[in-house]
Amino acid sequence: MDDHVEHNYNTSLEEVHFKSLSDCLQSSLVMDYNSLEKVFKFSPYSSPFQSVSPSVNNPYLNLTSNSPVVSSSSNEGEPKENTNDKSDQMEDNEGDLHGVGESSKQLTKQGKKKGEKKEREVRVAFMTKSEIDHLEDGYRWRKYGQKAVKNSPYPRSYYRCTTQKCNVKKRVERSFQDPSIVITTYEGKHNHPIPSTLRGTVAAEHLLVHRGGGGSLLHSFPRHHQDFLMMKHSPANYQSVGSLSYEHGHGTSSYNFNNNQPVVDYGLLQDIVPSMFSKNES
């Protein structure tokens, strides 16, 4: 009798156990931990499954709960907002840095341009005893200014080469110590040849420089300054080049020569037309 009662009791307990467990698993996603305690006869103190509230401050929430509340916790939402904020800040910072970089580049370019303007051009100055201020040198010039010179009654005239994209300038003034001397200073380098209409005249008068030992001085200067020494005036109007200074940067070199020495040879023209000079000598 007792065995039968005990068997029925165990059977009913198994049915209740199965029914209660299946009901608990199929009831909802959030388990009823209190019913599990009744089925497995856990005490409230020893049960690892305790009813918890979806609070952010609960340390067991991320470990025991599978509810959507945990998956959308504030710990996952904040980095997105912070990431967006940081990305925005990064973009702003990059924009600021980019702007600063561009401005610094512009300043650097401006500084370079200013530095290039401050660089001194090559200058060649020579004195000529002449009654004419503006001496012919083979190039075309345009006068763009005139300025008074301190302690001198003679003004200084400024000229610019008329060829496009040529920045060569020259200034002409008379010496206040000796008004018969004209000081002509060239600045820069011509980026073009002598105009074709003046080549023949200048080449023919190249003899004036070669006479009197001037040939060695002519070849001691760069090619673009050799044309400056080819004058178009006759010896009756001036006494060739009395002195010449060559300035590059901070160094200046002076040369003196005389045009009244006896003729040694005919220079370049004798090489070109030797028959002409042989007839004259005969």
Curated annotation (Swiss-Prot):
Location of the DNA-binding region in this protein: 130-195
GO annotation, cellular component aspect: nucleus
Subcellular localization, as worded in the UniProt entry: Nucleus
GO molecular function, one term: sequence-specific double-stranded DNA binding
Location of the region described as Disordered in the Swiss-Prot/TrEMBL record: 63-121
Biased composition (Low complexity): 65-75
Keyword entries, A-Z: DNA-binding, Nucleus, Transcription, Transcription regulation
Keyword hit for Nucleus: yes
GO biological process, one term: positive regulation of DNA-templated transcription
UniProt feature, compositional bias: Basic and acidic residues: 77-99
Predominant place of localization: nucleus
Keyword Cell cycle on entry: no
Described function: Transcription factor. Interacts specifically with the W box (5'-(T)TGAC[CT]-3'), a frequently occurring elicitor-responsive cis-acting element.
Protein family: Belongs to the WRKY group II-c family.
Name used for this protein in its record: WRKY transcription factor 71
Source organism per UniProt: Arabidopsis thaliana
Gene: WRKY71
